[in-house]
Amino acid sequence: MVPTGQVAEKQACEEPRQDRELKSWRWLVFYLCFFGFMAQLRPGESFITPYLLERNFTKEQVTNEIIPMLPYSHLAVLVPIFLLTDYLRYKPVLVLQCLSFVCVWLLLLLGTSVVHMQLMEVFYSITMAARIAYSSYIFSLVQPSRYQRMASYSRAAVLLGVFISSVLGQVLVTLGGISTYMLNCISLGFILFSLSLSLFLKRPKRSLFFNRSALVQGALPCELDQMHPGPGRPEPRKLERMLGTCRDSFLVRMLSELVKNVRQPQLRLWCLWWVFNSAGYYLITYYVHVLWKITDSRLNYNGAVDAASTLLSAITAFTAGFVNIRWALWSKLVIASVIAIQAGLVFCMFQIPDIWVCYVTFVLFRGAYQFLVPIATFQIASSLSKELCALVFGINTFLATALKTSITLVVSDKRGLGLQVHQQFRIYFMYFLTLSIICLAWAGLDGLRYYRRGRHQPLAQAQALSPLEDSVQAISLQDGDLRRPQPSAPQLLPEDGSVEDGRADLRVEAKA
């Protein structure tokens, strides 16, 4: 039996250590959020299209040669950057992102040819792919119980940075009379400062997939291990002899779990929305500034529109958190309605030759997309482990990038149809209209099945349990607990999404 004095002495020693740890992670989170804010301060980003046209690049070169390089290179670097982010434990990829931004703005300031601008797009695609490092980094700093709050802090820092950057750029251009060249010089200065901040970030000791040595040292197992603990885990050396490496075994189990979860109707639905709607959304944001310049070459309120759309996106995303309906029944109808609204807004963009209509419709278009992003995030994550969430979001992003790359190759690239921007927007309108009709027909079929079975009988889709829920229910029954299982919902943010949001110029993706 431990004497009372020794217990009190031990508790007295533990309290200062806990206070130091609390102050330490709070400082790390604050520093990371400050870095995320400063990394978004690029006031020249909203004015890149006017800048390129002032540098004597033609609208055809910008539309059919320079911009198409962005989705091509993004598709090429997406998977390598995703793997390197986890393997190198985040910090090196954040430094790489800042270095790539430096290269982007040096090429903008010093480049004189189409090839230089295409190389600029390649470096920008690296910054887009590297956004996953920022959103994932914060989860390695805190305990799972703090994920939701820390994710909101990091997201708010990014949105605030995008908003301030857009407002600053518009004020400098409209009131200060600063040229777009000088605006890009100011952006380069902010980027160099954010690069210096990235060098002092703490490199985590662990990551989600590759750096899992903490398991050997007695740390908590991953969520997949908790879901399927098995009869017992062999010693590390024995496991290495049996499977080669612990990493290979972990990835195999993840893929196996992913195959089981594919049968969930809600998961399939929202993943399909993510792929198809994201592809169309980013195609619009890539080319919308070219459309504005053609509609009215005199007015230049790109920064103000970016700021307004960012603010509305934050409001709609916040509002989505309070929507409480039976998603198993109404998901398809909600998706169809939002996509139909997007189709109507795209139609107004290219059909009504008024720059203010173009501005307003784009702000509403971004807000409509951002309204469904948090809903889709929760619907996908609500019955998956944290590891599977990261994998599913990565696959969704890759498929969306592949789709928009294919559309770009056919519609925009000079080696394809090489259409002008108004013709492209007409095709994008048909794209969103087709998606809305498909979703509406799908929702109608579900509604007919629902009323044929009787209003008081739930849909079969809503009754299906995910593998995670099955495992939780099995464990509950074994323990004699007959209560209904309540699967946890890990709070993960997509690439974000950043916020995969955007630069409302050639590459609004970095601000979404």
From Swiss-Prot:
In Gene Ontology terms, what is a biological process of this protein?
Answer: response to xenobiotic stimulus
Region Disordered, residue ranges: 479-512
Protein's cellular compartments = Cell membrane; Apical cell membrane; Basolateral cell membrane
Tissue specificity, per the record, is: Expressed in liver, heart, brain, spleen, lung and skeletal muscle.
Kindly list the residue ranges recorded as spanning the membrane.
30-50, 63-85, 90-110, 115-137, 152-176, 182-200, 267-292, 301-323, 330-350, 354-377, 392-415, 424-448
Q: Which InterPro entries match?
A: Folate_carrier, MFS_trans_sf, SLC19A1
Where in the sequence does glycosylation occur per the annotation?
Answer: N56
The task this protein performs is described as: Antiporter that mediates the import of reduced folates, driven by the export of organic anions. Also acts as an importer of immunoreactive cyclic dinucleotides, but with a lower transporter activity. Mechanistically, acts as a secondary active transporter, which exports intracellular organic anions down their concentration gradients to facilitate the uptake of its substrates. Has high affinity for N5-methyltetrahydrofolate, the predominant circulating form of folate. Also mediates the import of antifolate drug methotrexate.
Specify the species: Rattus norvegicus
Which residues face the membrane's Cytoplasmic side?
1-29, 86-89, 138-151, 201-266, 324-329, 378-391, 449-512
Sequence segments annotated as region (Required for substrate-binding): 400-412
Q: Which residues carry this modification: Phosphoserine?
A: S466, S471, S476
Where are the N-acetylmethionine residues found in this chain? M1
Q: Where does folate bind?
A: I48, T49, E121, R131, V162, Y281, Y282, Y286, R366, Q370
Which intervals carry biased composition (Basic and acidic residues)?
A: 500-512
What PANTHER family does UniProt report for this protein, alphabetically? FOLATE TRANSPORTER, REDUCED FOLATE TRANSPORTER
What's the protein called, per UniProt?
Answer: Reduced folate transporter
Q: Which residues form a coiled coil?
A: none
